[in-house]
Amino acid sequence: MESKDQGVKNLNMENDHQKKEEKEEKPQDTIRREPAVALTSEAGKNCAPRGGRRRFRVRQPIAHYRWDLMQRVGEPQGRMREENVQRFGGDVRQLMEKLRERQLSHSLRAVSTDPPHHDHHDEFCLMP
């Protein structure tokens, strides 16, 4: 009788131990709800592995990335960018005007019938 009682106690203890282990494993399973997905060649350009080496998960692409950047124009950094673009645009415009004036002055000097004055540094003559 005693051996049967001990056998029953041992079984009960083993069952209790297994139930405790199952309870400890359940919270970990609820934390890891995402299914493991293996990367394929069709994964796309926006996907990359994340996490440990054992599991490979596909990182979700950023859907509203460009929209978010466009909304940031109202922030101080965006306003600074707009001011810089305007300033640099004005500088480039001035440089282009100066370059155009110089090119026109040189071309007009070559076409004009006036005798050349004392700036011979840009003219070339092969006559002796």
UniProtKB/Swiss-Prot annotation:
Tissues/organs with expression: Primarily localized to neuronal cells within several regions of the brain, including the olfactory epithelium, bulb, peri/paraventricular nuclei, suprachiasmatic nucleus, arcuate nucleus, median eminence, lateral hypothalamic area, thalamus, hippocampus and cerebellum (at protein level). Expressed in brain, mid term embryos and to a lesser extent in ovary. In testis, it is expressed in the pachytene spermatocytes and spermatids but not in spermatogonia.
Region annotation His cluster: where it falls in the sequence: 117-121
Record's GO cellular component terms: cytoplasm; nucleus
Main location: nucleus
Regulation: induction: Down-regulated following RA treatment. Up-regulated in parthenogenetic embryos.
Post-translational modification comment from the UniProt entry: Phosphorylated. Phosphorylation of Ser-105 protects it from the proteasome.
S-S pairs: none
Phosphoserine PTM sites in chain numbering: 105
Location relative to the cell: Nucleus; Cytoplasm
Alphabetical list of InterPro entries matching this protein: BEX (IPR007623), TF_A-like/BEX (IPR021156)
UniProt keyword list: Cytoplasm, Developmental protein, Differentiation, Metal-binding, Neurogenesis, Nucleus, Phosphoprotein, Ubl conjugation, Zinc
Listed Basic and acidic residues bias regions: 14-35, 115-128
Binding site for Zn(2+): 125
Keyword check for Metal-binding: yes
GO BP term, pick one: axon development
Domain of life: Eukaryota
Residue span of region Disordered: 1-55, 106-128
GO terms for MF: metal ion binding; molecular function inhibitor activity
Signal peptide residue numbers: none
Quaternary structure annotation from Swiss-Prot or TrEMBL: Interacts with neurotrophin receptor p75NTR/NGFR. Interacts with OMP.
Protein's job: Signaling adapter molecule involved in p75NTR/NGFR signaling. Plays a role in cell cycle progression and neuronal differentiation. Inhibits neuronal differentiation in response to nerve growth factor (NGF). May act as a link between the cell cycle and neurotrophic factor signaling, possibly by functioning as an upstream modulator of receptor signaling, coordinating biological responses to external signals with internal cellular states.
Similarity comment text for this entry: Belongs to the BEX family.
Free-text domain note: The histidine cluster (His cluster) and Cys-125 mediate zinc-binding.
Listed name of the protein: Protein BEX1
